Each structure stands twice: as C-alpha cells, then as structure tokens.
C-alpha cells in the first residue's frame, strides 16, 4: 500500500512515511539592527558601552537552531547513504542482467565509492 506525497512522481510506502523525521521549522531572525535616523548620538554610545554577553552565553534560540541544523544534517547524511546503497544495488542488478559482458566492456560506468560520503562527519550528541 503506497501513498502519494507532495511530489506527484514520488511514491513512499506508508511505513517509511510514518518513520520520517519532520524537519524543524525555520525561526525568523533579524539580519541587521534597525537604528532610527532620528536617534541622538548618545544612544549609539550607550549601545557601545553596554556589556556584551560572554562567549559561553548561548541563547535558547541559538541552541534550538543548532539542534535543528544538527538533526537536518543527520537526516541528509542518512538519505545520502541510502541513495548510495540504492545505486550500488542497481549496479549489481544491471551487472547480473547483462551476462557475457566483462566489467571492462560494460556500457555503464562503474560506481566507485564516493569520497565525500567516506569523509562525512560522524555526529554524536
């Protein structure tokens, strides 16, 4: 039993959909600070003299964003590994279906292990 996902050509078994990890929603963050043009210069001086948080200070928003990025990166790594496994399985199937062709005479290029996947960081919490 398969269900259609948001992509019309992609079918995902219901079991896989149930196990899918939802991606974190992005939180809006200001890209710059809006300073009022009518602000007196003293306000600017006050901003400079305020005590900045220490390096060890980690706001909850940053930690939440980092956790989302971490989870998304883990998911992307897992998907890339699954895609490589599918490609390797496909290559093995094609090789079995084409008897009499040597590996040197094959019209399909051999899949070599992707060096990028071998050097993916192993994340641990």
Curated annotation (Swiss-Prot):
Residues 103-125 have a biased composition (Low complexity). One of its GO terms (cellular component) is cytoplasm. Interacts with HSP70. Associates with HSP90. Interacts with TSSK6; this interaction is direct and recruits TSACC to HSP90. Residues 1-12 have a biased composition (Basic residues). Pfam families: SSTK-IP (PF15836). Belongs to the TSACC family. It comes from the Eukaryota. One of its GO terms (molecular function) is protein-folding chaperone binding. Co-chaperone that facilitates HSP-mediated activation of TSSK6. Expressed in testis but is absent from mature sperm. Coiled coil: none annotated. Keywords: Chaperone. This is TSSK6-activating co-chaperone protein. Residues 1-23, 97-125 are annotated as: Disordered.
């Amino acid at each position: 039993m398969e269900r259609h996902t948001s992509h019309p050509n992609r079918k995902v078994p219901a079991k896989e959909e149930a196990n899918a990890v939802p991606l974190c929603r992005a939180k809006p963050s200001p890209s710059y600070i809006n300073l009022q043009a009518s602000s007196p210069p003293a306000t600017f001086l006050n901003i400079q003299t305020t005590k900045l948080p220490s390096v060890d200070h980690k706001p909850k928003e940053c930690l939440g964003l980092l956790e989302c990025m971490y989870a998304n990166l883990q998911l992307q790594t897992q998907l890339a590994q699954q895609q490589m496994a599918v490609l390797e399985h496909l290559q093995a199937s094609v090789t079995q279906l084409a008897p009499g062709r040597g590996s040197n005479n094959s019209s399909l290029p051999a899949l070599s292990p992707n060096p990028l996947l071998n050097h993916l960081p192993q994340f641990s919490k």
